[in-house]
Structures are given as C-alpha cells and as structure tokens.
C-alpha cells in the first residue's frame, strides 16, 4: 500500500507548478550545495589495476592446487607409516632416539655419583652441567635452611677464553650468582678476605683450574666448602695439570679425613688427548677423578642425533718445498735475532715460508713490526733486559736495533703475492674456497695450528676477497698474554662469532680455541688447513659441522708419511673409542629408555589396555609409542607448521620410590601437551606407560579416531577451525533510528528540565546572540561541548556549544506551557518555514529564550524560571508579526528579522533604510540574490524593488497589483544563510548578501535577532543531541551507563570503509571512502581499546573458569567469545538490534525536525525514507561492539573502576564462560590450586627474593612465580608446578591492555593506525626479550633443552652488545652513559621465544598472586616498560619493518621500481578444499608491473599479505638489478611515481 502521506505529497507536487510552491520551501532546494551525503560513486579503475587484477586472477586459477596444498606432505600414507613404524619397532635392539633421552639419564646419574661424561662435541654436555649446577645450588639452599655450613660450586676450565665463554652461558641459564675469574683479573686482589667475599656473594665460580688450585694451596678455600666440581675438557686431568693437582692434593686427602666432599662432574669428547691406549687412559682418568665414565653404547647413533658431517674428504696438495729465507728476514736477523721478544717470530718465519709461501714471511714482518707494535716491543725489550740486570749500553743497543728494524721495514719494497711466492698448500686452500663459495649459504671454519697463520690467512683473503665472490673472512684466536697484533680479547671473540652467525662473516680462520668450548654457530664446511695431531682434535673440530649437508675436509701433503700415519692413527683411535664405549660395563653405559624394549615389556605383567568397542582397535603399552609418533607426523599438515619445527615427543624418566616414572612432553602444535605415566620397575615400561596415557587423552578428546589414527587434520578443538571471522565486504541494509526514545515520552508535562545552550565564544557568530533553553520532560544527559563552525576556520570563527544541564526542574503552569508552545512553534515557522499543528502534549521539547548572556554562570541558578525571558514569551505569543505602517522612525528599521511569507528560503536581517531608492527603482546591479518564480525569470514583471520583494503566487500578486504603498521606504537587508549544518567546516558559496526591498509584502518577526541568531544553530545542536540520545538508547538496552559522548563515539561510523582497511598490510596509507565530516570522533580508537579489554576480560575468565585446560584450549574458548562472528550475532539479535543505533550518516537538513503534523512548509518524507536505513558491513557491526566496551572502560577508568566494562563484555559476548558482572567476580570465581598453596622450598624462596629485588614485587605465593619460569621442556616432576604457557596466555592479554591504555591516553589525537603501529613496538617479542634480559629474567628460565640454553646465550650476548653500543654512542655525544637511546633493541635480532614468553608469564603471575589486582600490572608497566618509551617518536618507523612496507622500500631503493601492487582475494573453494573445516582462505599476491612475483594462502588477508611479501623479498634478494629489469620488464624512471599508487592494494 505504501505510505499515505507519501501519496498525498505526490499529489500535491503534481498539482503545483514550480513557481507556485515557493512558500513551502525551507531553503533546502537552494541549499543542495551544502549537502555532504552525496551518493558514493564507484571509483574509476585504472588500466594498470585492470591488468593487475586480470593477471592475479589468472595466477590464482593456475596455482590454486599448489596454493591449497599443505606445505609439507607425508611421503607415505598414514597406514603405511604406522605399519612401517610397528615393524621397525619389533625388530632389533633399540638405541637412544633423542638427545633428551640420554641427557636426562646422564643428569640423573650425575646427581647420584661422580661422573665423567664421554660424549661427542655438540651433544649437550654443558646443558647437563647447568642442570647439575642448578640442582646442586637448590640443594645447597635447602641445606643452609637446615643450618649446614655454606658451600659453593666451581666450574673449572683449562683456558681463560673458555672461562668467559662458560660463564656467559651459565650466567644466562642459572638464576644464581655466577662469578668468573682469570689470573689476570684478580692478580691484585689475591687475599683471604677477597675470597671470603666471593664465597659469601656467589653460588658458582667459573675460573681456570690454577686459580682454585692456588686458593686451596693457600687455604683461602677448603675442599669441604665446595659442593660441586665441574671439570670442562676433563681429559686434561693427568700428571701435574691443575685438574690433577686439585684432586690428588685436596680431594683425595679430604676423602681420607672423612670430609664432606663435593660431587665431581667431568666432561670430555674423549678420555685421551694423546697417542696412548684409550682403555688405559680411561681407567687412569676414572681413578684420578674418583668418578665413573658415562658414555653411549653406540656413539655413531648419538652423532646422528646431534649432527655430524655428511661428507668427509681428503685433499692432497703437492709436497712443500724446503723453506727459503727471504731477503727481508736476512736483513732483520743480525739486528734483532738475539732479542728474545723476536725469537718466536723468527721461528714462525721458517714455518710460514714452507707452509704458506715466502710472500707471507715478508707480510708477517710488515704486520708484526708496525709502528704501534714496535713501540710495544721496544718497551718490552727494555723491561726484559732490565730484569736481567743488563748494562745501560746493552739496553740502548737493543733499543737502537729495534728502531733500525722499523726503518728497514719502512724502506722495504714488498712484492705482490705472485704464484711463485705462494705454497701449494695455500693454493689448494684458495681453490677450495673458490669452489665452495659459489654457494651463498656456506659457513666455513678453517682450522690452523698457529695464531699467526690465522692472522696472515685472514689478511691475505681479506685483501684478495674480490677474487672469490661472496667470501667474507674473519679470524678467531684465543686470548694471549703476550704482546703482538694477534692478541684478541674474549669480547672480540664474541664479536667475531656474532658476525659469523649473522652472515657478515662467512669464513673464519681459527686456532684450537674454536675446537673446544667456544660456542660457534653450526657451520657446513670445515677445512683442516693444519692436520689434526690428536683424535680429540679431530672429534672436536668435526663437531663444529653439524648441519645436515656439511662437509669436513682434511688437507694433507702428498707423499708425507707422517700425515698418512696421523690420519690413520686418528681413525683407528676413534674405532678404539667406539669399541671402548661398546664394551663398557652396564653401569657406565647410557642406553636410554628404548634399550631392549620388548624384553622388559614381556617381563611386566601389570600393563593397561584400552579397546575401542566400535572397531575392536586396541591401545597397548607396546603400540602406544608408534601410534603417538604417527600422530606427531600429522602435525605437519597444520597451518601453523613451519619447515624445521621439531615434531618429536620428549620423554623424561626419573627415579622415584618403587622404580621409575616417565613424563612425555609434546611439541607446541599438539593439542595435548603432556602426560605422566605410572611407576614401573624399569625405564622402558615407564616410558610406554607415559605414551599410553597421552594416547588415551587423545582418544578421549577425539583427536584419535576409532582406528587409532589421527583426526588432527580435521579436528582440534571443537571450535578451532570454525568460521569465526566476518567479512568487511559483506554488507546489508538495516533500519537506522532517527529519533531517540526520549522524544516519544509525550503528554502534558508535569515538570520540565532545562538545558541551556551556550556559546563558549559568542564573538565567533557574526551578530549578537543569547543562550536558549531547551526544556524536556526528562533531564538530558550532560554532553561534552562540541565544536560549531560558525564561519571560516582561518578567521577563528568557531565556538564550542555547551549544553549546561540544570538540576532544578520547572513546574509549568498551563499558561507557561501555552507560552512555551507558541514560542517553539514560532521558531519553526519563522526561521525554518515549518508550521506544525501541535500543542504542548505533542511537542517532544520546548525552546525558551533566556534573559542572560553567554558568560552568565547558569550553574549557580537556584530556579531556572528566573533565567527565562517571560516578557519576551508573552510578546511573541501575542502577535504573529510586528506591526508596520511605513511611517516608523528610522531606528525602527534596525535589527529586525524579516520573513518572506511566500518563499520559505527568503529570510533577512534588517540593516536600515536606503533613502535614495524607491519601490519602483530598478534592483541595483550588486544584488546577487534574485527571485526564483517564473514571471521574474521570464521578465514578465518589472525588475524593480517592489517586484523583487513580491514572491507570492501569481493570483495574489495580481490581486494586490495596485494596492502597495508607493511611498514606503526601501530597506537594506542581509540575506540570511540557508546553511543548517554548523557541525562541519563547509565552505559556503560566496554571494553578496545585501539586498533592497520593501517591508509591506514581508512579515517582521516578533523574535528578537539575538534569539534568531542562536536559533539558527538549533538544527546542528538538536541533531547532535539526538545522536547522543540514540546512542544512549543503545546503552540502555545493554544496561550500560556509558557517558553519552563516549557512547556516540562508539556508535559513529563516518566513512564507507571505516574498520575495513588492513592498516598494517596495505602498501599505501589508509584513505577513507565517502568520508562524512561533522560526525565527531568515530569508533576506531575506542574499538582498539575495547578490543584489548575484551581480550583481557575473556582471557581472565577462561583462565579462571577452566583451570585444567591448556593454552590451546584457552585460545579456542576465548576465540569463540571475542570473534567478530559472535559479536555480530549478539548485536543483531532481536533483543538488541544494535545496527539500528549505529550512526553512519552525517547531518541532513531534513531529519532534525520533530515528528509532528505539518500544516505548512516542505515535508521531508522522501528524505526521511532515504535516511531511515543504511548499509553496514558485518564487521562494522562487530567493531561497534568492541567500541562500546572501550567506551564503558573509559567511562569509569579514572576511578580505577572496571565493573562497567566487565558488564559490557558479558552483555556483548553473551557466553557461559564470561558470566561476570563486576571486576571482583573474576577472583571470586578463582579456585586456588593445591600446588600454589604448597609451602615453598628454599630455591623457590630464593628465586622470589631475587625477582623482588629486580622488579619490586614481593610474591605471596613463590610457587606461582616458579610456574611462570618453568619451560614446557622441563618435566613436571622436578617442580610440581604447571609450565608457564597458561600464565603467559594471561599475561599477554594483561600486558597488551596496559600498552593500549597508555598509548590511548598519551596520544588523544592520534588515529588507530598510529596506535596500532606503536603498540606493535611495545608488545613485540623484540622489546619483550630486551626487557626480560634487562630484568635478568633469562637467568631464571627452568628448561631442559640444550638448544634453548645456547639460544638464550646468543641472544643475551647480542642484546647486551647492542646496549653497550648505545651507551658508547651516548658517551661519544658528550652525554652520560646512562643517557643512552632506549631503542637500541630495535636492530637486535629476535629473541628465543621463551624469553618474551616468561616476561608475559611473569605479568600473569603477579596478577594471580595479587588476587587479580590489575594495578600491579600497571605498576610494573610504569616502572619497567615506560622508561623505554618516554619518547614515542623514536618508534615512528618501527612499523616500517613490516614485511609489506619493507618490500616496497626494498624494491624502490634496490631496483628503482615503483610499479608494485598487492592483491588479496578469498580463495575459491573447489571440491572438498576448505569444506571440512569451514575455514575461509585468503590468497594474497605481490605484483610488479602487473606480474605476480609471489603469493601465499593464509586464514586471513593480513597473514596472507605478510607471507606473500616475505616470499617475494626472499626471491628478489637473490636477483641482480639486470635480472630484475629483464624478469619484470621494469621501465620505471627515477623520481617518477606510479599514477594510481593509492589503488595498489586491495582491502581483504
């Protein structure tokens, strides 16, 4: 049927001509130029983008199969894999399958007895030593608590460099004080008091063995004050070596005297380091160290686990020639040969001439006798001779000889390195390097015997690197007390190793320092330039090549029998070592938990079984291990899997009362993280029991099907793969509310509540004005002042509009209501040409004039009635217009408001009389506003002032044709603006406002001009008030008392693509589409804040209500609540219909009027019909939910009251896992677990105290802190607390909230993109790792994984070096070192994940320990995080490291190309792809000149774009400029910009 009123209007429009409906106009037709809501037009697609879209679509179609295929597929199907594993399980004796297996066994053995670990290089002996040290110190703390004397542990090394190396590793991995000493560092502090202080201050001391030997010798330390002795490279224990002296002189004698002796733990790759019998050496080593050897039954098997070279090659070089003395050496010999400082140099010159070539001898002298070095040698010569009591003339003679040598060097002409001056050995090395360094991935170590050889080879290849492209050399030598330019410090060694790790150096020339001890990143090429003299050298240097495709090369001299003998002897000795290991007694073998599994399973009767009734499939102890391994293999099919991830189960077996117990720990991708088996008498059965328990959990949780095969591909958590995202492209039409509920409360008002409308800057209005009252039946909320644009902004013609709500109501009489009604209706008719048929019962609000000015303090009013201008109300009520005869005095014609009763668009401000004009005078030429009726346009009437003043209908004009007073004065007026929207800065079309007319056809309004001036602002004011009230209606539905301005901000969407941009993933900056000004702040900032609070609130809820699930389940439970799909569904529900309250359209001149019966004036039914619906994306509706949560948070934040935000979360997620209605409900629901309340042991108390000293927070429950630092690799049975992942999950959300809240408040004018980019810096793993290290958290991480320890050490070294460099830079700039730039971490590498993880877990731990007191999180944030972010400007470019942004920079800077594009589309689903899981897959592609470079598929556009950009970067990095130009036909010119660069990215 349609709307009857609409039909009526259509009839009226057909009945009138355009000239006859002028009186119904309200200026809206002529004001069309001020309308901001122009329909958005589809942007023109450029030719470039069309090509890109076409090519991208073709590429997607071509590559769809490969895109949807999993990154890694199993080579065999699951059935075959399982069958194969079972067959392999049943046959043959099992050996150690995992390094963790033997490490834990060795650790347990070392706790019980003195042990020498004989294991290959790289097998994790240092990890075991660290575990043993941690265990020993923890036990020591318990002993002290019982009153036993204090003892300390010593970690002994053979070389000074190793002391600093091992100290760095232990300091990073132990939560106790670790000191390091070398003879040089303490030579001036060697006193009893000094050592007493060290024993009191530290728990572990790392030093060279001689230091401890002397301490024991001088009785500074007694043997019974030591609880653990660790001997690194224990094979040195022989004869009078300090290792042997410590044992013989102090340990053995202490044993005879019954002293409390330390545990001994020795580490070595071989019990021998010389050409002696292995068995005899082993017996002697065990005897000397009072220990038993622990080794593996099959060393080869262990090497397969820890890595060893794939290829071992012997290269022969031609026989070396007899050394020839060079001319320079000949000349130097008589000068300095007798000087002891040069004896080693002359000896090396002979070896260098033969081994390297004569060119190197002269180069050695050139480097050795540099000016700086010679000055040192001269001084040393003088000191040496002085000690020998040499005569002064002898000293002077030697000094002059050194100076003569320096002059000789300066004048010598050094030859170029011609082939004839180089040895065959050097040429062979050069050829090898040239051959291998065609591959950019090569990392090479060249082992040499002498320090000077390393120095000279580095110098040679550094100077001639251009001859071998890609070769970047460095040297690594031990610290040497002697002078000379080859001296290196430990810090320089670390820098070299870091450079090697980063790839800045890819070839190191190293002495034996790189063989033993120093932790060098795995390389893939080892070259023995000088042959291994002993088997242990061979084993240790070979252990440096651990990558799967590595190569080990021996250089031997052709025809050299000694070389062949040494090679043969080393090989035979290794065979003997293997045979020795195989023949060790049972108590010395590490066999692991798989050894002879079948035998032990047959012996054990008490085994559990589980049968699945539907299929008869049976889970047993025997098949649980292969079933579990098959399940692990299927984890490769998951999206989170990355190449190189370790998909193995770690079994930790401990000795307990009654036998052994095993805990199996799964990799992070597994939905079940761990299980503990039952106690059995053998390790083998205990291990099977743990595997059985974990498989049983997988069956119960439906991850194994009825045939015991993995269902992980299809099912994880019940909602893990659910379609939880909503599209920003999926839009629909929805109703939109135009009027608030408060206006529907009609009837005769008993009380009226006054809100006064005040201009903060009334001078911004071009004429005087006075405040107005708006009177309502219900009090209006106190709104925040909002800006009105009253004129040009550049002229500062803006003012805030203050809505001052008065508390005391008015009780109106019937007369009062009549006066107010007439005044209100008069404003509508005279100013806005709307005559309504309404009484006081029908009006939603009333206007009233005040008798005060804008500066009056209305808040002091006791009774608002006293501020109402009642005389004016009566004046307006008594007349429709002011009387006019034409004979009034001249002052009458000032400051009047003139209404044209026949044309609603014509209103004038009366300015005075124009005495030189009459009503018959022609309209002056400067009048720009002309009548619009047809007769005027057709010049059917005279263009004089009288007819300009007449706009009545034709019949009316003709009826009065000769009745107008000809002598009435012509007045001057200013055309009143048609503008209604003062909420936006709109540039009005400038026309001359002055006009000349007569008053007889017009009406003089009884409204004073100062009232009218203010009333002109009512459309904007009423619109904004209504928007606030509608927003509050939404909050009322949600039962949330949100501040009105925050409520409106949360519901405001001011552009078509608001909330739809992938801010951090688009190549270009975000630009709003169809932006609508004047709406105030939009929801995006509050959405970001609300998103963080929503994440935090739901995280706390699931952590509290589901204590027995793991992090994976937590993520799924939280995801279901916070996902856009859930928020969208709740918002659209019938009891909310939140979409109706979203404000998506700016001011429109027809919608502010009250809904009343219109008697006269233009209706807006058509406009209202357009405005009562809007198109919204699903995501926009979900975003508004988050923004409302942010608004609720902000409403009460200043009082530290989060109850309102908690209620908002509960209402908007509508989920059983978040029933809380106030903050205290979280902790009220928390049930403290038993492990938390157990008494803390001494180690836990010690840890809590140290953390308190570092952070300032004192734990009430130290075991919660312990949990925060327990890595998943550490078995549960060690600490009896959960690992840190649950607390990390909690802390991540808490920390994120603290960061967003901080940024939100320090940058009130910054948009969501700025907030997001700077939050990225604060929550990045890079920063969290840096912060954790600065607090010393890395030392407390409790892990049982060798690679984690080394990763921590590497990262701590790098971040410490970065900080030191920042301090150096501050000092160089003349600042204190403490004034270093706090962004030093930005360029540091990514930390091992466990470091930022424990920091987040710590945040979660303090929250739990403090009974859910969020203020402790804020205190931690302010105390420890903010110092790094005192200035956010230094992080403005942090987001530029984003892969997409970095790609564009790289392409432009490297190749000068700017014709790039980024496209993303949802992947078309074909066949069954994506249907099982219901996932939405998005494919993104990076394009250059319309050609797809690389693409990737992920679950969201964000991650697809990141992955595509990274792949594209990897591809382009290997290309030369010419290859790039050829491949992509690039013709970009420098300095030129792409024409349509803003369209280079799609929004998915």
Curated annotation (Swiss-Prot):
Q: Kindly list the positions annotated as binding Zn(2+).
A: 1457, 1489, 1530, 1532
EC annotation from Swiss-Prot or TrEMBL: 3.1.26.-, 3.6.4.-
Question: Carries keyword Transmembrane helix?
Answer: no
Where is each RNase III domain found? 1051-1197, 1248-1411
Compositionally biased intervals (Basic and acidic residues): 1-41
**Which residues make up the binding site for ATP?**
119-126
Looking at the record, the residues that make up the DRBM domain are 1445-1518
What does the record give under GO molecular function?
A: ATP binding; DNA binding; helicase activity; metal ion binding; ribonuclease III activity; RNA binding
Annotated positions for site Important for activity: 1393
UniProt-annotated stretches for the region Disordered: 1-48
Instruction: Report the residue ranges that make up the Helicase ATP-binding domain in this protein.
Output: 106-289
**What family name appears in the similarity comment?**
Belongs to the helicase family. Dicer subfamily.
Q: Under which name does UniProt file this protein?
A: Dicer-like protein 1
Species annotation: Cryphonectria parasitica (Chestnut blight fungus)
Q: The organism's lineage?
A: Eukaryota, Fungi, Dikarya, Ascomycota, Pezizomycotina
């Amino acid at each position: 049927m349609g709307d009857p009123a609409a039909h009526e209007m259509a009839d009226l429009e057909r009945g009138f001509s355009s000239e006859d409906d002028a009186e119904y106009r309200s200026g809206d037709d002529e004001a069309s130029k001020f309308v901001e809501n122009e329909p958005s037009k589809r942007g023109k697609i450029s030719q470039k983008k069309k090509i890109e879209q076409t090519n991208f679509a073709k590429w997607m179609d071509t590559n769809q199969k490969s895109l949807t295929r999993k990154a890694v597929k199993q080579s065999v199907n699951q059935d075959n894999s399982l069958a194969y594993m079972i067959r392999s399980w049943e046959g043959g004796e099992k050996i150690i399958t995992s390094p963790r297996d033997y490490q834990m066994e060795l650790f347990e053995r070392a706790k019980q007895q003195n042990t020498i670990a004989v294991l290959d290089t790289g097998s994790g002996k240092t990890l075991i030593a660290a575990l043993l040290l941690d265990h020993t110190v923890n036990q020591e703390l318990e002993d002290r608590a019982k009153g036993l004397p204090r003892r300390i542990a010593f970690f002994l090394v053979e070389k000074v460099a190793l002391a600093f190396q091992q100290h760095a590793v232990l300091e990073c991995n132990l939560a106790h004080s670790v000191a390091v000493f070398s003879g040089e560092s303490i030579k001036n502090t060697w006193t009893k008091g000094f050592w007493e202080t060290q024993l009191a201050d530290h728990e572990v001391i790392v030093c060279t063995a001689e230091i401890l030997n002397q301490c024991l010798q001088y009785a500074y330390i007694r043997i019974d004050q030591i609880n653990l002795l660790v001997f690194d490279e224990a094979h040195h224990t022989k004869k009078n070596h300090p290792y042997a002296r410590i044992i013989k002189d102090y340990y053995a004698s202490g044993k005879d005297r019954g002293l409390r002796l330390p545990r001994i733990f020795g580490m070595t790759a071989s019990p021998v380091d010389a050409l002696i019998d292995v068995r005899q050496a082993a017996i002697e080593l065990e005897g000397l160290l009072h220990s038993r050897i622990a080794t593996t039954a099959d060393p080869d098997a262990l090497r397969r686990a820890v890595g060893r070279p794939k290829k071992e090659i012997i290269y022969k070089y031609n026989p070396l020639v007899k050394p020839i003395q060079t001319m320079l050496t000949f000349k130097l010999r008589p000068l300095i040969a007798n000087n002891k400082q040069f004896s080693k140099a002359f000896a090396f010159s002979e070896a260098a001439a033969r081994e390297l070539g004569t060119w190197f001898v002269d180069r050695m002298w050139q480097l050795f006798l540099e000016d700086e070095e010679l000055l040192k040698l001269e001084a040393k010569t003088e000191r040496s001779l002085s000690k020998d009591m040499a005569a002064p003339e002898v000293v002077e003679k030697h000094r002059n000889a050194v100076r003569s040598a320096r002059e000789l060097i300066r004048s010598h002409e050094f030859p170029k390195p011609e082939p004839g001056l180089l040895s065959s050995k050097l040429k062979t090395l050069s050829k090898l390097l040239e051959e291998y360094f065609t591959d950019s991935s090569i990392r090479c170590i060249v082992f040499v015997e002498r320090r000077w050889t390393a120095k000279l080879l580095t110098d040679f290849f550094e100077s001639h690197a251009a001859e071998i492209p890609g070769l970047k050399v460095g040297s690594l030598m031990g610290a040497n007390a002697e002078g000379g330019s080859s001296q290196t410090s430990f810090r320089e060694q670390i820098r070299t190793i870091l450079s090697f790790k980063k790839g800045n150096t890819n070839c190191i020339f190293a002495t034996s320092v790189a063989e033993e001890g120093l932790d060098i990143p795995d390389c893939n090429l080892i070259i023995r330039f000088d042959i291994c003299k002993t088997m242990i050298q061979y084993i240790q240097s070979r252990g440096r090549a651990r990558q799967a495709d590595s190569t080990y090369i021996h250089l031997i001299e052709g025809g050299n029998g000694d070389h062949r003998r040494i090679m043969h002897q080393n090989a035979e000795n290794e065979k003997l070592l293997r045979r020795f290991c195989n023949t060790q007694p049972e108590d010395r073998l590490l066999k692991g938990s798989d050894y002879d599994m079948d035998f032990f399973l047959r012996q054990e009767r008490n085994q559990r079984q589980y049968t699945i009734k539907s299929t008869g499939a049976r889970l047993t102890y025997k098949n649980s291990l292969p079933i579990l391994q098959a399940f692990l293999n299927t984890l490769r099919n998951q999206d989170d899997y990355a190449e190189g991830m370790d998909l193995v189960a770690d079994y930790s077996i401990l000795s307990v009362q009654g036998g052994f117990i095993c805990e199996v720990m799964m990799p992070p991708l597994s939905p079940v993280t761990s299980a503990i088996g039952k106690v059995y008498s053998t390790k083998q059965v205990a291990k099977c029991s743990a595997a059985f328990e974990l498989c049983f959990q997988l069956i119960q949780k439906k991850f194994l099907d009825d045939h015991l095969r993995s269902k992980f591909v299809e099912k994880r958590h019940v909602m893990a793969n659910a379609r939880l995202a909503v599209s920003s492209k999926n839009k629909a039409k929805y109703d939109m509310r135009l009027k608030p509920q408060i206006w529907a409360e009609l009837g005769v008002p008993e009380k009226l509540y006054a809100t006064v409308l005040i201009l903060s800057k009334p001078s911004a209005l071009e004429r005087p004005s006075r405040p107005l009252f708006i009177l309502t039946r219900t009090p209006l909320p106190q709104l925040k002042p909002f800006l009105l644009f009253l004129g040009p902004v550049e002229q500062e013609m803006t003012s805030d509009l203050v809505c001052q709500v008065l508390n005391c109501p008015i009780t109106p009489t019937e007369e009062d209501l009549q006066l107010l009604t007439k005044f209100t209706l008069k404003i509508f008719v005279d100013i806005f040409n709307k005559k309504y048929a309404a009484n006081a019962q029908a009006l939603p609000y009333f206007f009233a004039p005040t008798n005060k000015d804008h500066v009056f303090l209305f808040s002091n009013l006791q009774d608002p009635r006293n501020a109402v201008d009642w005389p004016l109300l009566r004046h307006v009520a008594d007349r429709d217009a002011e009387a006019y005869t034409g004979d009034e005095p001249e002052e009458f014609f000032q400051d009047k408001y003139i209404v044209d009763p026949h044309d609603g668009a014509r209103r004038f401000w009366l300015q005075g009389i124009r005495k030189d004009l009459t009503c018959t005078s022609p309209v002056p030429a400067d009048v720009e506003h002309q009548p619009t009726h047809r007769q005027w346009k057709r010049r059917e009437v005279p263009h004089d002032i009288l007819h300009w003043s007449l706009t009545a209908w034709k019949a009316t004009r003709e009826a009065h044709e000769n009745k107008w007073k000809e002598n009435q004065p012509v007045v001057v007026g200013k055309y009143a603006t048609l503008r209604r929207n003062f909420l936006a800065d709109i540039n009005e079309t400038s026309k001359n406002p002055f006009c000349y007319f007569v008053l007889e056809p017009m009406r003089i309004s009884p409204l004073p001009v100062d009232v009218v001036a203010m009333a002109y602002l009512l459309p904007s004011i009423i619109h904004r008030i209504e928007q606030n009230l509608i927003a509050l209606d939404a909050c009322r539905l949600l039962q949330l008392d949100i501040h009105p301005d925050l409520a409106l901000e949360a519901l405001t969407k001011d552009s078509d693509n608001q909330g739809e941009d992938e801010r951090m993933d688009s190549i270009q900056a975000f630009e709003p589409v169809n932006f609508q000004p004047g709406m105030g702040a939009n929801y995006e900032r509050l959405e970001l804040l609300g998103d963080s609070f929503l994440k935090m609130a739901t995280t706390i809820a699931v952590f509290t209500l589901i204590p027995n699930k793991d992090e994976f389940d937590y993520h799924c439970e939280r995801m279901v609540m916070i996902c856009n799909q859930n928020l969208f569904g709740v918002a659209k529900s019938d009891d909310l219909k939140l979409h109706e309250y979203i404000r998506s359209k700016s001011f429109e001149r027809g919608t502010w009027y009250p809904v009343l019966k219109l008697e006269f004036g233009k209706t807006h039914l058509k406009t209202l019909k357009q405005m009562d619906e809007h198109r919204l994306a699903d995501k926009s509706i979900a975003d508004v939910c988050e923004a409302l949560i942010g608004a609720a948070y902000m409403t009460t934040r200043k009082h530290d009251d989060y109850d309102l935000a908690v209620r908002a979360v509960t209402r908007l997620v509508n989920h059983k896992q978040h029933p809380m209605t106030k903050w205290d409900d979280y902790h009220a629901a928390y049930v403290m677990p038993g492990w938390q309340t157990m008494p803390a042991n001494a180690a836990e108390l010690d840890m809590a105290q140290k953390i308190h000293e570092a952070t300032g927070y004192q734990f009430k429950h130290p075991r919660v802190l312990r949990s925060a630092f327990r890595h998943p690799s550490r078995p549960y049975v060690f600490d009896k607390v959960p690992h840190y992942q649950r607390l990390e999950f909690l802390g991540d959300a808490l920390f994120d909230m603290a960061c967003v809240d901080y940024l939100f408040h320090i940058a009130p004018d910054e948009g969501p993109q700025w907030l997001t980019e700077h939050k990225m810096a604060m929550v990045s793993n890079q920063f969290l790792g840096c912060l954790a290290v600065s607090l010393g958290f890395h030392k407390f991480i409790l892990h049982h994984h060798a690679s984690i320890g080394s990763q921590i050490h590497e990262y701590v070294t790098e971040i410490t070096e970065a900080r030191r460099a920042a301090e150096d830079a501050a000092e160089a700039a003349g600042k204190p070192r403490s004034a270093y730039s706090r962004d030093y971490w930005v360029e540091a590498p990514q930390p091992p994940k466990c470091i930022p993880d424990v920091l987040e877990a710590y945040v979660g731990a303090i929250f739990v320990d403090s009974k859910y007191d969020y203020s402790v999180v804020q205190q931690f944030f302010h105390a420890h995080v903010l110092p790094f972010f005192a200035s956010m400007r230094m992080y403005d470019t942090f987001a530029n490291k984003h892969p997409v942004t970095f790609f564009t920079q790289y392409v432009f800077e490297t190749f000068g190309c700017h014709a790039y594009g980024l496209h993303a589309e949802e992947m078309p689903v074909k066949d069954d792809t994506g249907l099982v899981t219901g996932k939405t897959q998005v494919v993104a592609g990076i394009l250059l000149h319309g050609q797809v470079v690389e693409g990737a598929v992920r679950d969201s556009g964000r991650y697809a774009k990141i992955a595509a950009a990274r792949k594209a970067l990897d591809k382009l990095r290997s290309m030369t400029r010419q290859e790039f130009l050829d491949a992509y036909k690039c013709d970009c010119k420098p300095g030129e910009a792409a024409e349509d660069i803003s369209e280079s990215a799609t929004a998915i």
